[in-house]
A protein has these predicted regions:
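A short acidic, glycine-rich active-site loop
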Residues: 54-65
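Active-site phosphate/pyrophosphate- and oxyanion-stabilizing loops and adjacent acidic/basic residues
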Residues: 25, 71, 94, 126
Length: 141
């Protein structure tokens, strides 16, 4: 049985990603793996100075949102890291996966309210599937 040592979750603060978060936590605990949770900030902020007030404020908002919404779910699991930065989400996830030699990337599938039984993958997900340096798991909502 293959075990995973480094797992990345491409995370967006949405209901679609909640299922992926739960699966990522489950797999990380089961495999005693490191869990990297990455949230891409608005790509239009790429290249801004790290001292830019808009960027600082956005990073603080993401950290606070993580602390209140996500950290309580993984508080007892010490092997996690959360990161966010302005980036193209798909390319950044693939870069991180390559850099840390990830064993698995998890993605949540988007749901369409008018088609409740249909899950779909958007451009970000398709790009990750095409460029990922490791296996990718799609998690339905």
């Amino acid at each position: 049985m293959q075990t995973f040592k480094k797992i990345i979750l491409a995370f967006k603060f949405s209901s679609a990603c909640r299922s992926a978060l739960e699966k990522a936590i489950q797999l990380s605990i089961l495999n005693d793996a490191e869990l990297f949770i990455f949230h891409a900030l608005d790509y239009r902020l790429i290249g801004r100075d790290q001292r830019d007030s808009d960027l600082i404020e956005l990073n603080q908002q993401m950290e606070q949102k993580f602390e209140t919404e996500i950290k309580p779910l993984i508080d007892e699991f010490p092997k996690f890291k959360f990161g966010s930065s302005p980036s193209d989400p798909a390319l950044e996830i693939c870069k991180i996966a390559h850099r840390i030699q990830a064993d698995l990337i998890l993605l949540g599938c988007h749901d369409e309210p008018e088609k409740p039984r249909l899950a779909r993958l958007d451009y970000v997900g398709m790009t990750i599937l095409e460029k990922a340096p490791c296996p990718v798991m799609l998690v339905p909502p």
